[in-house]
Amino acid sequence: DALPILFAAPVEPVVANAPPAAIEEIADQKLVSALMRLMADERIYRQDNVTIGTLATRLKIPEYRLRRLINQRLGYRNFNVFLNNHRIEEAKAALADPAQAEVPVITIAMDAGFQSLGPFNRAFKADTGLTPTEFRRQAIAGQTADAAEIARSG
């Protein structure tokens, strides 16, 4: 009438018995999370002369591993495309913000981490199909139209 012993041996963590590919996947997910926190919280992409080496050092991993994460796990062609994506997303938010309508495009570009206007304009147009000025005009006009619609319906 004794109860059966369900766990005769100490339970090993699941990771210990996982295949190496699964362990690598878990490690990669943790590194991607840490990388995205650096990008979102610290906005490391804004720093002058940020390199894959400086970022790898911050994450305490070799450069080749960070390069593989950016290329294979996140799907970016290279480190610069990855950085510029974050810079452009910040610039798009600033350009669409009516409170920043008078801020010069060059200021927004530099604040986002670009070193000069030319590379910013090229990267921005490649990403959005619009120049930064066209993007700003459309974004703010769209918000104004949305606000007018809300005012009419309210």
Task: Annotate each PLM feature.
Residues 1-3:
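Short, small-residue-biased leader/transition segments that mark boundaries at the very start
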Residues 6-107, 112, 123-126, 133-134, ...:
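Membrane-proximal linker segments that couple transmembrane helices to downstream signaling/catalytic modules
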Residues 120:
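Binding-interface segments
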